[in-house]
């Protein structure tokens, strides 16, 4: 954790800051790194900053900034350095592209869900109690349409009921309807 020890002096009895510890030098009063790189975790963070930017360049950048902006600059330097070490080619830009891609995917998914929701709101599904059983007049019964072999070709394809969109209620309703009114038809089990 980066501390905001803004008294800016040497570390007194605490020992050197993480940056001076890494550089193996004495931490003097007024050390620019002391408020931001503590002795415990600051050494590893400063090692990354030193590897990517160099201690001298990091020091110059911090000294040019007003005190109230230095903490943000150190956080940014550490993030950029760690990202550059993880991905030497793209650095933090690779992470930004990944996040932008994730945002675009989530926006597309949201639009899809909103479209499905508006469709469902316009055409609400009826519950099994509200459904009227079809009237089957034996005089007009089409034997060809009701033969199990013909219905199996219509209902036998699993993707008709399971399109992967999460319509579990609709699939259950369809299964109940088929089992009640078309007992000869065997539907694939819902997963």
Curated annotation (Swiss-Prot):
InterPro entries: LOB (IPR004883)
LOB domain: residues covered: 15-117
Top-rank taxon, per record: Eukaryota
Tissue: Expressed in shoots, roots and floral tissues, but not in stems or leaves.
Family: Belongs to the LOB domain-containing protein family.
Organism placement in taxonomy: Eukaryota, Viridiplantae, Streptophyta, Embryophyta, Tracheophyta
Any single Pfam family the record assigns to this protein: LOB
Protein name: LOB domain-containing protein 19
PROSITE patterns, per the entry: LOB (PS50891)
């Amino acid at each position: 954790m980066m501390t905001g020890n803004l008294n800016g002096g040497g570390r007194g009895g605490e020992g050197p800051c993480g940056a001076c510890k890494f550089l193996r030098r004495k931490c003097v009063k007024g050390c620019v790194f002391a408020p931001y790189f503590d002795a415990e975790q600051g050494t590893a963070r400063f090692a990354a900053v030193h590897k990517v930017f160099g201690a001298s360049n990091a020091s110059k950048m911090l000294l040019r900034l007003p005190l109230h902006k230095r903490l943000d600059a150190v956080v940014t330097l550490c993030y950029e350095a760690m990202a550059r070490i993880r991905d030497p080619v793209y650095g933090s830009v690779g992470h930004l592209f990944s996040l932008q891609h994730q945002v675009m995917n989530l926006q597309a998914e949201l639009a899809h869900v909103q479209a499905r929701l508006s469709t469902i709101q316009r055409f609400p599904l009826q519950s099994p109690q509200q459904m009227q059983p079809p009237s089957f007049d034996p005089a007009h019964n089409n034997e060809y349409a009701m033969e199990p072999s013909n219905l199996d070709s219509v209902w036998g394809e699993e993707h008709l009921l399971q399109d992967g969109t999460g319509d579990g209620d609709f699939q259950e309703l369809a299964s109940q309807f088929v089992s009640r009114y078309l007992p000869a038809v065997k539907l694939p089990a819902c997963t």
